[in-house]
Amino acid sequence: GPGMVMRAEPVLKAIEKAISKIKDKKKVKIINFSPSGKKFTTEYAKNSVKKYTDIILISGRYEGIDARVKKIFKAEDISVGDYVLTGGELPAMILIDCMSRQIKGVLGKFESLEEERVSSSEFYTRPEKLVYKGKSYKVPKVLLSGNHKLIEEWKKGK
């Protein structure tokens, strides 16, 4: 192939070391990042957080990691999108952030977890009227009304 493949031995040693520190080895999930893997979703994150106490992430580089590592540890291939990155570090960060949000107490407010937030596209703050290069941009009147029902309807319409 066009790039180097990471050797199995150092990765195997790292995974063994991580597993040795885990008490309940039956609740461990090992994930390998791959553009051809199962698509990572919020639903996947929720289910994983409920089912596993520990998750080990394999973040490859170059062409990837020796395939025997995945076979030995039954690692699941996960993809964060239909594109190729230079390594698994960014997918690991995405997974960690999304899964962490699912753990009680991580977020300050439960509302921060709402799935509806994914569909919210516009947010406003002060001042009510913003002037930029001679042009005025105003906060929509409905948001200033204080009428929560109308505001929710406006949000759903966006």
Predicted features, each with a name:
Residues 2-19, 145, 149-158:
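N-terminal nucleotide/polyanion-binding subdomain common to many enzyme families
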Residues 1, 30, 60, 140-143, ...:
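A residue-level signal for conserved active-site and pocket-lining positions in enzyme catalytic cores
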Residues 4, 57, 79, 143-144:
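Short conserved micro-motifs on helix faces and helix-strand junctions that flank
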Residues 65, 69-112:
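Structured adenosyl-cofactor binding patch, chiefly the S-adenosyl-L-methionine
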